[in-house]
Amino acid sequence: MLITTPDTQQLVFTGDEQHCTVNAGDYRLALFSAPLHFKLYRNDIVVQESATDGHFVRQHRLPPFAKTDAGWIVCLELGDDESIYGLGEKWGKLDKRGQLVRSYNHDALGVNTEKSYKNTPYAWSPEGWNLFVHTPTPVTHGVGYAPWSQRAYVCVVEDTLLDMFLYHCDSPAKSIHTYISLTGFAPVPPKWSLGVILSKAYYKDSQELLAVAREVREKNMPCDVITLDGRAWQDTDTRFAFEWDPTRYADPKPVLDELKAMDFKICVWEYPMISVKNPLYAKAAEKGWLIKDKRTGEAYRYEWDLSPFGEVLTPLPDSGILDFTHPDAYEFWKESHKPLFELGVDMIKADFGEQLEDDNMLSYSGDSGDRLHNVYSMLYNRCVYEAAEKYCKTGPFLFSRSAWTGSQRFPAQWGGDPQADWHGLAASIRGSLSWGMSGGPFFATDIGGFYKDTRDAELYVRWAQASVFSAHMRLHGIGPREPWSYGEAASDAVFNALKLRYRLLPYLEKATQQASETGLPVQRSMALAFPNDPLARQFEQQFMCGESLIVVPCIVPGGKVKFYLPEGDWVRFNAASTSPTDEDTYQGGKYYEQILGLNELAVFVRKGEQVVLGPEVEHTEMDMSATTMWP
């Protein structure tokens, strides 16, 4: 998972059997025995130490360090009002203080619990210290979790060896940069990926797909990418084998050629599983390319939980799981993308990857399902990204749902399957910001929500408006997501949002370049952007987009927003007006409440700064050279 190791320094050891000191540059690590505990100094100031939570009848409530049958326990000290951030894509409060968080990738089936698709055992404190556990195994974090200890960070690592980084930085930006220096920087995504991505589950056939694409262009809707989800181009019973459903796509080339003629990029779906009903299953099993069952020595037959499926998304077939630890299987899967890219596909939606859930599973590498489970996502991401690097003429770029430490090297990720309601919108924003605080700079959500769609036009509008300021912007869910399907008022508001998105592309390009160089996400939480403002940290739903824009998404019906602006003067951003008035200026260090009209946004620029804007275009193949500065 590491792409490099830290620069080695000359270590100086002093001490005896009871106490040992290790000096390295500005750092000094003091180790004590009986029981083992430590203090970490930087420039002679304690920056972290073992938890000091004592107990009435014993020395420690929890051991500072311990090796158990389940793995390792490490307990770190927390200040009384100390916040902790990171730990991957999480839907609840960004400040993990008080939470029990598990670093384990789930098919979360929503955004309503602690379970999530993208995890990494990396956390940081505004006080400057960072913890990164370098392991593929599950890690449980009791972050000031009161049933364990409200004054300690308790880390339970389910591994035989303990490999962890504990370091200190002067700012959250430097903290994330250090973590990314270890695990890998994200390449800059192609410009077209910053445009609008249109999708749904799912276009029934080529006639519907082309009809929607033509309507998009006829209505002058800004859009760059159209997506064929899993059931849109594959036969569900026999997927996945890189085969077009012959009953609907006897010859897919003319269909893709027509989409190309309309200046669409094309995204197709995949998952790393092969139906037992496909001849490829027997071939892959014979070659040892599938995850095996320890009990039989044969390919493990994965059986789906049928409860999430219904009339639209029908049950999936029993399947084998591709073993990415087998070099030949990895190469086969990568090379199998070549015909898709040669046909005109530009992007892969790499779905699933969380299915190694059973310790009876065994990989070619000798790892069990539990040990391989998390890192499998990263191997899957890497394989697909390498295929795009090798064969895609317009990429590489993909959307992956599951991710682990290092997956940020293979952009980008999207936030799984949110419920189509206001809670789903709010949780999706938090998930995006949490992933960004964990080293993942590029993210998208399902605009409108994925499941339990009630055709709530106001929700759809607000979701689209918030997503204008995310790294990537995708309209997706069960059922149509074209703006006009929500009525005239919603369509007008979303069209305005999409037009603004394209005008912001020069600004967003700069933000993605900075993300690639520094690890700072396009969407930055207030805690990350304003680490020295304790009040700003409390506003977890608003965020910075790039360096200049504070975005206050509307996450409740009726248009009410509550927000805080840091110190200084701020100007309300309105790309349609190049001359802001005194009424558009807001004093910082204050809290505000407003009611927004359906077409209104609460976005602010620090007074004196400018935002570069491009022209109004419908896709990135159009001339975008003319730029202006706002204001």
What are these regions (language model features)?
Residues A186-P189, R217-V225, A250-C267, K292, ...:
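Secondary-structure transition/capping motifs at alpha-helix termini
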Residues L131, P138-G142, Y202-S206, A232-D237, ...:
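Flexible loop/turn segments at secondary-structure boundaries
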Residues L194-K200, L228, K260, F264-K277, ...:
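Aromatic-lined carbohydrate-recognition surfaces of secreted/lumenal glycan-active proteins
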Residues T4, L11-P190, K200-A201, S206-Q207, ...:
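Catalytic and substrate-binding clefts that recognize carbohydrates or anionic sugar/phosphate headgroups
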Residues D26, Y122, V216, L259, ...:
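Conserved, mostly hydrophobic/aromatic
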Residues Y385-P396, A403-W414, A427-S428, W435-T445, ...:
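Catalytic core of carbohydrate-active enzymes
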Residues G230-W233, E243-P308, N360-F397, A412-Q413, ...:
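Active-site-proximal helices and loops of the catalytic beta/alpha 8
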Residues P187-G366, Q408:
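Aromatic-lined carbohydrate-binding/catalytic grooves of carbohydrate-active enzymes
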